[in-house]
Regions:
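Short hydrophobic/aromatic beta-strand or adjacent loop that forms the aromatic wall/cage
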Residues: 82, 177-181
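Acyl-donor-binding surface of acyltransferase catalytic domains
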Residues: 1-34, 184-187
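Positions that flank functional sites
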Residues: 72, 149, 172
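Non-catalytic, surface-exposed connector residues within folded enzymatic/regulatory domains
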Residues: 66, 120-121, 176
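Conserved glycine-rich acetyl-CoA-binding loop
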Residues: 114-128, 137, 141, 148-155, ...
Length: 190
């Protein structure tokens, strides 16, 4: 019976394509992170945080790469299968990650760390937090795309266990740069 229920739940999730990441039972992994004597607070992103996320993107991306505030608001307020986590230092947003779950895959849509706060483990911390959510949601895969020219990010993702599985030709529309598809297989605990 349990096997049948699991199959039905998996089938339903694939049909609907959503699991609730706003459920009060969603365990929020860690509430803070310490690096170089700084204590960062972890916060689940809400619609009101969209402007802060746009500002963060502006520090790291070219204007044509920035997700609009309206899209981020919609992602955080209406899509129950999306999750945004922010890291704050003294109430100042310094990093965020966006992800969504569909079926057995957790996909990172966005990871930004403000220059000046990079290379302090913040990106790695956020990736680990989303991975724990993915494991709690019984995901088998953790995926993302990265610019072919972004060697620093690729190094981080490889360090985290992601493998390059393909090239998406001209994936980034602003300059037609190829994107590398990367996947990490997740091992579910019994």
């Amino acid at each position: 019976l349990k096997n049948w229920i699991d199959q039905l739940q998996s089938w339903w999730t694939n049909i609907v394509g959503q699991v609730s990441l706003r459920d009060s039972s969603l365990p929020l992994i860690q509430e803070s992170y310490t690096s170089q004597e700084r204590v960062y607070q972890l916060k689940v992103g809400q619609k009101a945080d969209a402007k802060s996320l746009v500002n963060l993107q502006e520090t790291a991306y070219s204007p044509s790469e920035i997700w609009p505030e309206s899209l981020l608001e919609r992602e955080m307020s209406t899509k129950s299968n999306s999750l945004y986590l922010l890291l704050l230092y003294q109430d100042y947003p310094v990093a965020f990650i966006g992800a969504w779950i569909k079926g057995d895959n957790c996909h990172v849509s966005n990871l930004v760390v403000r220059p000046g706060y990079q290379r302090q483990g913040l990106g790695q911390f956020l990736l680990n937090q989303v991975e724990q959510v993915a494991l709690n949601q019984n995901c088998h895969y953790y995926s993302l795309e990265v610019r072919e020219s972004n060697h620093k990010a690729q190094k981080l993702y490889h360090k985290q266990g992601f493998e390059t599985v393909g090239v998406k030709k001209e994936y980034y529309s602003n300059n037609r740069e190829d994107g590398l598809a990367m996947v990490k297989q997740l091992i579910l605990k019994d």
